[in-house]
Amino acid sequence: ARTKAALQKNPKNVLLAVCWMQGEFDMSAATYAQQPDLFTAMLKQFRTDLSGFNAQCHGGSAAVVPWICGDTTYYWKNTYGTQYDSVYGAYKNRESDNVFFVPFMTDGNGNNTPTNLPAEDPDIADAGYYGAQSRSNGNWVSSNRPTHFSSWARRGI
């Protein structure tokens, strides 16, 4: 509904891509194996719903607007290995559908990408960055800190 509203609001608006960063909590559900089919159905419905805006879509068609599906932290893969392979594996090898998987779990050197664990997300006061180290239950994203990436870790992408 938001995408449609944005396209309706201004005919100069163009949908370039969809950035999809979801799936973590699907892994902890008993129904995790249904997620790949549900994702495909959602993708098809989204594209159908926006077909009236083809002229405002990258490539001239809602059917070819790229979906960029981002990875999650290593916590989820370590905790829910089978489920991770089912949910996140469904985003992989779908280039023919214009669905692209972006691995974020490790950096360019193969090291685990830092999470919101205080030891992995220190404050860098000289840079004006206050990470998980200075956060408490009043201002953190989740009490399960390794489930989210450090904000500093993903800069520059």
Regions found by a protein language model. Name each.
Residues 1-157:
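Cell-envelope and extracellular/periplasmic
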